[in-house]
Amino acid sequence: MSDETVASVAQLYLGNILYALERAALSLEEDNRRDDAAFYRGIARKLAEARGRERGAQAEAR
């Protein structure tokens, strides 16, 4: 059995996840679904901000 968690996998692939969310948002914008695009960008923003806070806390701990 693996010790992987959702958080550890998401952290490992965060850049790929953010890229995929932006690609989805761009595609939705092309289909004039701006509200849906904004929703996916909002998810990406929350993930990126959480990672930034996490890195800041790690830097302070050093």
Language-model segment annotations:
Residues M1-A24, R55:
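N-terminal acidic leader/helix
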Residues L18, A44-R45:
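Short linear sequence elements within intrinsically disordered, low-complexity coil regions
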